[in-house]
Regions:
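Anionic-ligand binding patches
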Residues: 1-143
Length: 143
């Protein structure tokens, strides 16, 4: 989905992988463009039937790999599920970064930017993937 792996460089539907000159646009503008692109897709009848959290479903993904040689590869991948707010005026919070102010977590009734650092680390894709990889490392003999 959009913005995918290009999230840091996302510059709207015309430049989903970033501007040709490589310049970045401000994050608040990226957030506006992403909400508008989602709203336009939904208004045009985009198929959202496969989205498990409804038509505004979104997730962050973190994958980590520990490579200790050809026969010793360990992978951890985790997600944080949420939804994208309907309008930029619904953005909230000053914590976090990137899309956090528009990434709403229904189970907390907050955006990711409204969570404390401790709350976010407990549920974030990065926190979960890191803890999983630490468990893997702790179980490996002869690192």
């Amino acid at each position: 989905g959009i913005p995918g792996i290009y999230s840091s460089r996302y510059a709207g539907p015309e430049f989903p992988k970033g501007r040709p000159d490589g310049t970045k646009i401000p994050q608040d503008e990226q957030n506006r463009l992403l909400i508008a692109q989602l709203n336009n897709a939904l208004a045009a009848g985009a198929d959202t039937s496969r989205l498990k959290n409804g038509p505004r479903s979104a997730h962050y993904t973190c994958a980590m790999v520990l490579y200790l040689g050809n026969d010793r590869v360990f992978i951890s991948q985790e997600t944080m599920e949420g939804i994208i707010v309907e309008k930029i005026e619904d953005a909230a919070g000053t914590g976090g970064f990137g899309y956090d102010p528009i990434f709403f977590l229904p189970q907390y009734n907050k955006t990711a930017a409204q969570l404390t650092a401790e709350e976010k680390n407990a549920i974030s894709h990065r926190g979960k993937a890191t803890r999983a990889l630490v468990r893997i490392i702790n179980g490996i003999e002869n690192i």
